[in-house]
Amino acid sequence: MILNPKHIKIQDFNYDLPDKRIAKFPLPVRDQSKLLLYQHGKVSEDIFTSLPSYINKGELMVFNNTKVIQARIHFRKETGALIEVFCLEPIEPTDYALNFQQTEHAAWLCLIGNLKKWKGELLSREMIVKGRLIKLTAERKEAVGTSHWVDFRWNNKKVTFADILEVFGELPIPPYLNRDTQESDKVTYQTVYSKIKGSVAAPTAGLHFTQRVLDALKEKGVDMEELTLHVGAGTFKPVKSEEIEGHEMHTEWISVSKSTIESLIHHGGKAIAVGTTSVRTLESLYHMGVTLILHPDASDEQLKVKQWQPYELPASAKDISSVDALQALLDYMNRHELDTLHSSTQIIIDPGYQYQVVKAMVTNFHQPQSTLLLLVSAFVQGDWHTIYDYALSHNFRFLSYGDSSFIIP
């Protein structure tokens, strides 16, 4: 076991990824992608439609039902300069659902493309929304780190901010695809079970699932639950520090229903996670429960999982089971009469991390020197090279629109 995960060198997680191995577009049929199987150190391959045959009746699979929003809005100044306003997370109001229902005004934390050309003047643009000509304006407020507070206003009480994004916005696709968003991406860059708007990137392991695969899982008797983690742009943030200690993880918002937590407890506190976002959410739930066991009166703020929290637990927390932690979380929800837990996580999963809830995962192939590759390495006790060497030598497609793997450590 690595004694101090903070001192892991990111260079140790590098590999050569030729550009031709990065899938620029998805396959015509989602579930015909290749599936790498890593089972207790042994590697083989199949196609994704066969996934249900590797999962036992009565096991629990957990999916992230977030939906990607059309977060990129372009404004052209009178000078001709193009400004991109990339919506990251809501500020006024901070609740995603409430913000999307706002009329006439909404405020978001945004990344600004071509910032030097935006001197602070009001940007505006007109488009037809619901049969009406709508003028949208954007006003840049104060900087928040590398982002900015942006006030959006529009001149119609019957048009919501969700409507605004649907018409004025463009779906953001990963920067490493090196291409413009196409109309087809509106369908192919969403999971078939996406429901809750808020992500600026798709939980891409889920892109392989079709209704046919979901039906096959159901017919086999596999239990399925959903949770929500809104994927932030930070998921593409490269690790620039030599050691992981110098990398600040992005915070992401999560929502988990009481019924999902009850189901997790019923399944012995163990689940198969679909995608790294589900992994991070499930493991964060464990650490929220641990916080409640150690501090029964913990506030909402104290429940939010911090980056290095899992590695700094007191000795008294080392033997807390996933069932006990999840039960503490369920008791907390019952006390506060909550049907859904809303919180956030900044968790980083490095080699040295002890997985508590996730017993298997479906995941795509990740970028070299990324925190997601660290997460996979932690899951297979450092054996990530076995997986990636096989994928590279057997013509697997990489990254968001690429193939996937099913990992049982």
Regions found by a protein language model. Name each.
Residues 1-409:
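Surface-exposed, charge/polar-rich loops and edge strands
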